[in-house]
A protein has these predicted regions:
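RNA pseudouridine synthases
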Residues: 1-348
Length: 348
Protein backbone atom coordinates (compact mmCIF):
# COMPACT_ATOMS: atom_id res chain seq x y z
CA UNK A 1 0.00 0.00 0.00
CA UNK A 2 1.36 3.39 -0.98
CA UNK A 3 2.34 5.67 1.88
CA UNK A 4 1.00 9.18 2.23
CA UNK A 5 3.73 11.79 2.52
CA UNK A 6 3.66 15.49 3.29
CA UNK A 7 5.52 18.34 1.63
CA UNK A 8 5.54 22.05 2.36
CA UNK A 9 6.06 24.35 -0.62
CA UNK A 10 9.09 26.64 -0.29
CA UNK A 11 9.13 30.15 -1.69
CA UNK A 12 11.57 28.91 -4.33
CA UNK A 13 8.57 27.40 -6.15
CA UNK A 14 5.82 29.87 -5.25
CA UNK A 15 3.65 30.78 -8.23
CA UNK A 16 4.20 27.47 -10.07
CA UNK A 17 1.44 25.18 -11.35
CA UNK A 18 0.80 22.21 -9.08
CA UNK A 19 1.60 19.54 -11.68
CA UNK A 20 4.86 21.27 -12.56
CA UNK A 21 5.74 21.69 -8.89
CA UNK A 22 5.21 17.99 -8.13
CA UNK A 23 7.75 17.16 -10.83
CA UNK A 24 10.20 20.03 -10.28
CA UNK A 25 10.35 19.42 -6.52
CA UNK A 26 11.05 15.73 -7.10
CA UNK A 27 7.83 14.37 -5.61
CA UNK A 28 7.04 12.49 -8.82
CA UNK A 29 9.48 11.36 -11.54
CA UNK A 30 7.63 12.97 -14.47
CA UNK A 31 5.03 15.68 -14.95
CA UNK A 32 2.69 13.18 -16.60
CA UNK A 33 2.89 10.94 -13.53
CA UNK A 34 2.05 13.95 -11.38
CA UNK A 35 -1.01 14.71 -13.51
CA UNK A 36 -2.21 11.09 -13.24
CA UNK A 37 -1.84 11.17 -9.46
CA UNK A 38 -3.76 14.45 -9.23
CA UNK A 39 -6.56 13.14 -11.44
CA UNK A 40 -6.71 9.91 -9.42
CA UNK A 41 -7.35 11.88 -6.23
CA UNK A 42 -4.02 10.95 -4.70
CA UNK A 43 -2.81 14.52 -4.15
CA UNK A 44 -4.29 17.04 -1.72
CA UNK A 45 -3.46 20.74 -1.58
CA UNK A 46 -4.19 22.32 1.80
CA UNK A 47 -6.66 19.54 2.55
CA UNK A 48 -8.60 19.77 -0.71
CA UNK A 49 -8.53 17.89 -4.00
CA UNK A 50 -6.85 20.27 -6.46
CA UNK A 51 -6.75 20.72 -10.21
CA UNK A 52 -3.48 20.21 -12.04
CA UNK A 53 -3.37 23.90 -13.02
CA UNK A 54 -3.81 25.21 -9.46
CA UNK A 55 -1.02 27.56 -8.37
CA UNK A 56 1.06 26.69 -5.31
CA UNK A 57 2.26 29.27 -2.80
CA UNK A 58 4.98 29.19 -0.18
CA UNK A 59 3.72 27.41 2.93
CA UNK A 60 1.09 25.33 1.11
CA UNK A 61 0.79 21.81 2.52
CA UNK A 62 0.72 18.97 0.01
CA UNK A 63 -0.28 15.44 0.98
CA UNK A 64 0.50 12.92 -1.74
CA UNK A 65 0.72 9.18 -2.28
CA UNK A 66 4.18 7.82 -2.91
CA UNK A 67 4.88 5.98 -6.16
CA UNK A 68 6.63 3.13 -4.41
CA UNK A 69 7.80 1.32 -7.51
CA UNK A 70 9.27 4.43 -9.10
CA UNK A 71 10.16 6.93 -6.40
CA UNK A 72 11.53 4.70 -3.66
CA UNK A 73 14.95 6.03 -2.81
CA UNK A 74 17.65 4.02 -1.10
CA UNK A 75 20.16 6.25 0.62
CA UNK A 76 23.54 4.80 1.43
CA UNK A 77 24.59 5.27 5.06
CA UNK A 78 27.74 7.36 5.31
CA UNK A 79 30.00 7.66 8.33
CA UNK A 80 29.86 11.44 8.58
CA UNK A 81 30.53 12.75 12.12
CA UNK A 82 27.63 14.46 13.87
CA UNK A 83 27.86 16.79 16.85
CA UNK A 84 24.83 15.86 18.94
CA UNK A 85 23.74 18.35 21.60
CA UNK A 86 20.69 16.44 22.79
CA UNK A 87 19.16 13.05 22.10
CA UNK A 88 16.28 10.97 23.38
CA UNK A 89 13.95 8.38 21.90
CA UNK A 90 12.02 10.97 19.91
CA UNK A 91 14.34 13.67 18.62
CA UNK A 92 17.84 15.04 18.19
CA UNK A 93 19.40 18.47 18.41
CA UNK A 94 22.55 18.63 16.31
CA UNK A 95 25.13 21.30 15.57
CA UNK A 96 25.45 21.09 11.79
CA UNK A 97 28.91 21.74 10.41
CA UNK A 98 29.30 24.17 7.49
CA UNK A 99 29.32 22.57 4.07
CA UNK A 100 26.97 19.74 5.03
CA UNK A 101 23.87 19.68 2.81
CA UNK A 102 20.74 18.55 4.65
CA UNK A 103 19.44 16.01 2.14
CA UNK A 104 20.21 14.72 -1.37
CA UNK A 105 19.42 16.85 -4.40
CA UNK A 106 20.27 16.56 -8.10
CA UNK A 107 23.60 18.28 -7.53
CA UNK A 108 24.38 16.50 -4.24
CA UNK A 109 23.38 12.82 -4.39
CA UNK A 110 25.33 11.90 -1.27
CA UNK A 111 27.43 13.21 1.58
CA UNK A 112 24.41 14.76 3.27
CA UNK A 113 23.00 15.00 6.77
CA UNK A 114 20.41 12.37 5.82
CA UNK A 115 23.18 9.94 4.84
CA UNK A 116 24.85 10.58 8.19
CA UNK A 117 21.64 10.10 10.17
CA UNK A 118 20.88 6.68 8.70
CA UNK A 119 24.47 5.59 9.39
CA UNK A 120 24.29 6.57 13.06
CA UNK A 121 20.64 5.69 13.81
CA UNK A 122 19.30 3.42 11.06
CA UNK A 123 16.65 4.46 8.56
CA UNK A 124 13.92 2.63 10.53
CA UNK A 125 14.63 4.80 13.59
CA UNK A 126 14.07 8.14 11.86
CA UNK A 127 11.04 10.13 10.75
CA UNK A 128 10.20 9.97 7.05
CA UNK A 129 7.66 12.80 6.88
CA UNK A 130 9.44 14.36 3.91
CA UNK A 131 10.09 11.11 2.04
CA UNK A 132 12.63 8.31 2.12
CA UNK A 133 15.37 10.56 0.75
CA UNK A 134 15.07 12.90 3.76
CA UNK A 135 15.07 10.70 6.87
CA UNK A 136 15.05 12.63 10.12
CA UNK A 137 14.71 16.02 8.44
CA UNK A 138 12.19 18.44 9.95
CA UNK A 139 13.61 21.79 8.81
CA UNK A 140 16.70 22.89 6.94
CA UNK A 141 19.73 25.13 7.11
CA UNK A 142 21.57 26.26 3.99
CA UNK A 143 24.56 24.06 3.24
CA UNK A 144 27.05 26.78 4.14
CA UNK A 145 25.15 27.90 7.23
CA UNK A 146 26.26 26.19 10.44
CA UNK A 147 24.49 25.64 13.71
CA UNK A 148 21.64 24.05 15.60
CA UNK A 149 18.98 21.90 13.94
CA UNK A 150 16.14 19.68 15.10
CA UNK A 151 15.81 16.13 13.73
CA UNK A 152 13.00 13.66 14.46
CA UNK A 153 13.18 9.94 15.15
CA UNK A 154 9.56 9.12 14.33
CA UNK A 155 6.80 10.52 12.16
CA UNK A 156 4.52 11.57 15.02
CA UNK A 157 7.14 13.81 16.59
CA UNK A 158 8.31 14.96 13.17
CA UNK A 159 4.86 16.27 12.28
CA UNK A 160 4.52 18.03 15.65
CA UNK A 161 7.90 19.74 15.33
CA UNK A 162 7.17 20.71 11.74
CA UNK A 163 3.90 22.30 12.84
CA UNK A 164 5.56 24.11 15.76
CA UNK A 165 8.13 25.59 13.39
CA UNK A 166 5.38 26.61 10.98
CA UNK A 167 3.55 28.34 13.85
CA UNK A 168 6.81 30.12 14.86
CA UNK A 169 6.83 28.46 18.28
CA UNK A 170 10.44 27.33 17.90
CA UNK A 171 12.78 30.20 18.82
CA UNK A 172 15.83 30.23 16.54
CA UNK A 173 18.46 32.97 16.66
CA UNK A 174 21.44 33.50 14.38
CA UNK A 175 24.79 35.27 14.69
CA UNK A 176 25.61 37.18 11.53
CA UNK A 177 28.53 39.44 10.61
CA UNK A 178 27.67 42.02 7.96
CA UNK A 179 29.52 44.69 6.01
CA UNK A 180 29.30 48.28 7.26
CA UNK A 181 28.20 49.81 10.54
CA UNK A 182 24.46 49.55 11.12
CA UNK A 183 23.38 52.82 12.72
CA UNK A 184 20.47 51.63 14.87
CA UNK A 185 20.95 49.12 17.70
CA UNK A 186 17.73 47.33 16.76
CA UNK A 187 15.80 46.90 13.57
CA UNK A 188 12.85 45.26 11.89
CA UNK A 189 12.94 44.35 8.21
CA UNK A 190 9.45 43.76 6.81
CA UNK A 191 10.00 43.07 3.12
CA UNK A 192 8.25 40.37 1.04
CA UNK A 193 10.48 37.81 -0.68
CA UNK A 194 10.04 36.02 -3.99
CA UNK A 195 12.37 34.08 -6.25
CA UNK A 196 14.52 36.07 -8.66
CA UNK A 197 13.32 36.57 -12.23
CA UNK A 198 16.86 36.07 -13.53
CA UNK A 199 18.22 33.31 -11.32
CA UNK A 200 15.85 30.72 -9.96
CA UNK A 201 18.18 29.68 -7.14
CA UNK A 202 18.34 33.26 -5.90
CA UNK A 203 15.69 35.06 -3.86
CA UNK A 204 14.95 38.79 -3.77
CA UNK A 205 12.75 41.37 -2.09
CA UNK A 206 9.78 41.83 -4.38
CA UNK A 207 6.53 43.76 -4.69
CA UNK A 208 4.91 41.03 -6.78
CA UNK A 209 1.49 39.86 -5.56
CA UNK A 210 2.89 36.35 -5.09
CA UNK A 211 5.74 37.55 -2.85
CA UNK A 212 5.47 36.17 0.66
CA UNK A 213 5.45 38.27 3.80
CA UNK A 214 8.92 38.09 5.37
CA UNK A 215 9.91 39.62 8.69
CA UNK A 216 13.36 39.64 10.30
CA UNK A 217 14.33 41.46 13.48
CA UNK A 218 17.90 42.12 14.51
CA UNK A 219 19.88 43.38 17.47
CA UNK A 220 23.31 44.88 16.96
CA UNK A 221 25.79 43.16 19.27
CA UNK A 222 29.08 44.82 18.34
CA UNK A 223 30.54 47.22 15.77
CA UNK A 224 34.02 47.32 14.25
CA UNK A 225 35.85 50.27 12.65
CA UNK A 226 36.48 50.77 8.95
CA UNK A 227 39.70 49.50 7.39
CA UNK A 228 41.64 50.23 4.22
CA UNK A 229 39.51 47.88 2.13
CA UNK A 230 36.15 48.00 3.91
CA UNK A 231 33.62 50.23 5.64
CA UNK A 232 33.69 48.38 8.92
CA UNK A 233 31.59 45.48 10.15
CA UNK A 234 28.64 44.83 12.46
CA UNK A 235 27.87 41.65 14.38
CA UNK A 236 24.12 41.17 14.67
CA UNK A 237 21.74 38.71 16.27
CA UNK A 238 18.90 37.90 13.86
CA UNK A 239 15.54 36.32 14.58
CA UNK A 240 13.10 35.12 11.94
CA UNK A 241 9.36 35.68 12.20
CA UNK A 242 8.90 33.89 8.90
CA UNK A 243 10.93 31.12 7.35
CA UNK A 244 11.64 32.08 3.76
CA UNK A 245 14.51 30.66 1.76
CA UNK A 246 17.75 32.63 2.36
CA UNK A 247 15.71 35.15 4.38
CA UNK A 248 18.47 36.70 6.51
CA UNK A 249 20.85 36.91 3.58
CA UNK A 250 18.23 38.53 1.33
CA UNK A 251 17.10 41.00 3.99
CA UNK A 252 20.64 42.05 4.83
CA UNK A 253 21.33 42.64 1.15
CA UNK A 254 18.12 44.69 1.02
CA UNK A 255 19.37 47.11 3.70
CA UNK A 256 22.82 47.28 2.05
CA UNK A 257 24.61 45.37 4.80
CA UNK A 258 25.67 42.21 2.99
CA UNK A 259 26.58 39.11 5.00
CA UNK A 260 30.35 38.70 5.09
CA UNK A 261 31.50 35.82 2.89
CA UNK A 262 28.18 35.37 1.10
CA UNK A 263 28.91 34.23 -2.45
CA UNK A 264 25.32 34.66 -3.69
CA UNK A 265 24.10 37.87 -2.07
CA UNK A 266 27.08 40.20 -2.09
CA UNK A 267 28.22 43.59 -3.28
CA UNK A 268 31.16 43.29 -5.71
CA UNK A 269 32.61 46.44 -4.17
CA UNK A 270 32.99 44.78 -0.78
CA UNK A 271 36.39 43.17 -1.23
CA UNK A 272 37.12 42.08 2.34
CA UNK A 273 35.44 38.85 3.40
CA UNK A 274 38.03 38.20 6.14
CA UNK A 275 39.22 35.08 4.34
CA UNK A 276 35.83 33.35 4.47
CA UNK A 277 34.61 31.13 1.64
CA UNK A 278 31.08 30.90 3.04
CA UNK A 279 28.61 33.24 4.69
CA UNK A 280 29.18 34.32 8.29
CA UNK A 281 25.83 32.95 9.46
CA UNK A 282 25.45 30.60 12.41
CA UNK A 283 22.30 29.25 14.07
CA UNK A 284 23.60 29.69 17.60
CA UNK A 285 20.44 29.39 19.73
CA UNK A 286 17.33 27.22 19.67
CA UNK A 287 14.50 26.88 22.18
CA UNK A 288 11.40 24.72 21.87
CA UNK A 289 8.87 22.75 23.86
CA UNK A 290 9.53 19.04 23.77
CA UNK A 291 6.41 17.46 22.22
CA UNK A 292 6.43 14.43 24.52
CA UNK A 293 7.67 15.56 27.93
CA UNK A 294 6.38 19.17 27.70
CA UNK A 295 9.65 20.63 28.98
CA UNK A 296 11.10 23.73 27.37
CA UNK A 297 14.57 22.94 26.07
CA UNK A 298 17.15 25.50 24.99
CA UNK A 299 20.62 25.11 23.50
CA UNK A 300 23.45 27.39 22.42
CA UNK A 301 26.23 26.50 19.99
CA UNK A 302 29.52 28.46 19.85
CA UNK A 303 30.87 29.88 16.62
CA UNK A 304 32.81 27.32 14.56
CA UNK A 305 36.53 27.79 14.03
CA UNK A 306 36.33 29.45 10.62
CA UNK A 307 34.01 32.17 11.92
CA UNK A 308 36.13 32.68 15.05
CA UNK A 309 39.22 33.11 12.87
CA UNK A 310 37.40 35.64 10.71
CA UNK A 311 36.06 37.84 13.49
CA UNK A 312 39.29 37.63 15.51
CA UNK A 313 40.94 39.69 12.75
CA UNK A 314 38.81 42.61 13.97
CA UNK A 315 40.06 42.55 17.56
CA UNK A 316 42.00 45.81 17.15
CA UNK A 317 39.10 47.53 15.41
CA UNK A 318 36.35 47.02 17.94
CA UNK A 319 34.17 50.03 18.72
CA UNK A 320 32.20 48.48 21.53
CA UNK A 321 29.41 46.16 22.61
CA UNK A 322 25.79 47.24 22.77
CA UNK A 323 23.62 46.46 25.78
CA UNK A 324 22.29 43.38 24.02
CA UNK A 325 25.85 42.53 23.01
CA UNK A 326 26.92 42.41 26.66
CA UNK A 327 23.98 40.09 27.46
CA UNK A 328 24.65 37.69 24.61
CA UNK A 329 28.42 37.64 25.14
CA UNK A 330 27.98 36.84 28.85
CA UNK A 331 25.64 33.94 28.05
CA UNK A 332 27.95 32.81 25.24
CA UNK A 333 31.02 32.77 27.53
CA UNK A 334 29.15 30.85 30.23
CA UNK A 335 27.93 28.31 27.69
CA UNK A 336 31.45 27.87 26.27
CA UNK A 337 33.03 27.57 29.71
CA UNK A 338 35.12 30.73 29.27
CA UNK A 339 35.97 31.75 32.83
CA UNK A 340 37.96 34.89 32.04
CA UNK A 341 35.61 37.68 31.02
CA UNK A 342 36.17 38.94 27.47
CA UNK A 343 35.34 42.40 26.14
CA UNK A 344 34.52 41.46 22.57
CA UNK A 345 33.28 38.63 20.38
CA UNK A 346 36.56 39.12 18.51
CA UNK A 347 38.41 37.92 21.61
CA UNK A 348 36.54 34.69 22.33
Amino acid sequence: MARKLSNTVSDLYAGMRLDSYLFEAGLYPTRSKAVKQIEAGKVFLNGKEPAKKDIVNEGDLIIYEELVEETHVYLEPEDIPLEVYYEDGDLLVINKQPGLICHPSPGHPGGTLSNALIHHYGRENLAHIQGDDRPGIVHRLDGDTSGLMLCAKNDEVGYILQDEIRRRNVDRKYLCLVHGNIASDTGLIDAPIFRSDKNRTRMQVSDKPQARSSVTTFNVLERFESGLKDNGFTLVECKLYSGRTHQIRVHMEYINHWVVGDQTYSNPGKSSNLGLCRQFLHSYFIEFQHPCINDTLSFMAPLPDDLIQAISQLADRRIGLTERGHEVLAAYQENCGITEERESFALV
